[in-house]
Amino acid sequence: MRNIQIALTKGRLEKHVIPLFEQIGIDCSELKNKGRKLVFQSKNTDISFILVKAVDVATYVEHGVADIGVVGKDILMENEKDIYEMLDLGVGVCKFCVASIPTYNPKSYRKKCIATKYPHITSNYFHNKGEDVEIIKIEGSVEIAPILGLADAIVDIVETGKTLQENGLIVFEEMYSISARMIVNKAALKTKKDEIFSIINMMEQEILSGK
C-alpha cells in the first residue's frame, strides 16, 4: 500500500473524526497523544495524518500535499477548491442560521446589513432569495454585531444555540445543514485509486452500519 496522507481539522471536528478512523482499523494513538506535533504516522498502516486549520485543509488537498482531507461543508461552500468531495461523514452536524436580537424584522423591505465570517455563502443565500443586503465580514465573535448596532443580523454556524442564547440572540432562519466531508485530491484519486477507495468504502460502510 502506498502512503496516504490525510489532512484533518484541529479542534472540535478532529474529536468527531478520529473515532471513525479507529473503527475502520486505522491506529490513531499518536493523534490522541499529540502534544505540539502536527504530523503523525499510523502505527499499523501506511497512513499519516497532518493537523491544520480548518480553512487550510482543502488547500493542502487541492495542492496535493494531502491525498485526503476531512473538513466541514462550510469551508467548501465558502471557498471554492479544485478537489473531489467524496463522502458525507455525518458528524460535526451544525446549521447555518440567520440570527439577531428579538426586535429584528426579517420581513422588512429596508436593505439589511448582515455581519458574518462567511460573506460568499451569505451573499449567495440572500441573492437566491432576491434580497439585496450589505455584508460586513467579521473574523471574531459575530454575536456582538447586532447588539452594538453594527449589523441588523448575523449569519453564523449554530450547533447548540447556547452562545446565541447567552448573548440574547434568537434564530430567525435556518439556511443550510452542514457536516464533515471527506475530500480527495484529483491527481491522487488516479495514482492511488485503490488505496483511497479502500478507505472511502470502509468509512462508508461504517457510517451506514452506525445508522
From Swiss-Prot:
Pathway: Amino-acid biosynthesis; L-histidine biosynthesis; L-histidine from 5-phospho-alpha-D-ribose 1-diphosphate: step 1/9
Keyword Isomerase: no
Record's subcellular location: Cytoplasm
Pfam families reported in the protein's UniProt record: HisG (PF01634)
Keywords: Amino-acid biosynthesis, ATP-binding, Cytoplasm, Glycosyltransferase, Histidine biosynthesis, Nucleotide-binding, Transferase
GO biological process, one term: L-histidine biosynthetic process
Record GO cellular component, one term: cytoplasm
Entry EC number(s): 2.4.2.17
Highest taxon listed in the record's lineage: Bacteria
Alphabetized GO MF terms: ATP binding; ATP phosphoribosyltransferase activity
CDD domains: PBP2_HisGs
Catalyzed chemical reaction(s): 1-(5-phospho-beta-D-ribosyl)-ATP + diphosphate = 5-phospho-alpha-D-ribose 1-diphosphate + ATP
InterPro entries: ATP_PRibTrfase_cat, ATP_PRibTrfase_CS, ATP_PRibTrfase_HisG, ATP_PRibTrfase_HisG_short
HAMAP family per the UniProt record, alphabetical: HisG_Short (MF_01018)
Subunit description: Heteromultimer composed of HisG and HisZ subunits.
Family stated for the protein in its record: Belongs to the ATP phosphoribosyltransferase family. Short subfamily.
General function of this protein: Catalyzes the condensation of ATP and 5-phosphoribose 1-diphosphate to form N'-(5'-phosphoribosyl)-ATP (PR-ATP). Has a crucial role in the pathway because the rate of histidine biosynthesis seems to be controlled primarily by regulation of HisG enzymatic activity.
Domain notes: Lacks the C-terminal regulatory region which is replaced by HisZ.
Protein's UniProt name: ATP phosphoribosyltransferase
Organism: Bacillus anthracis
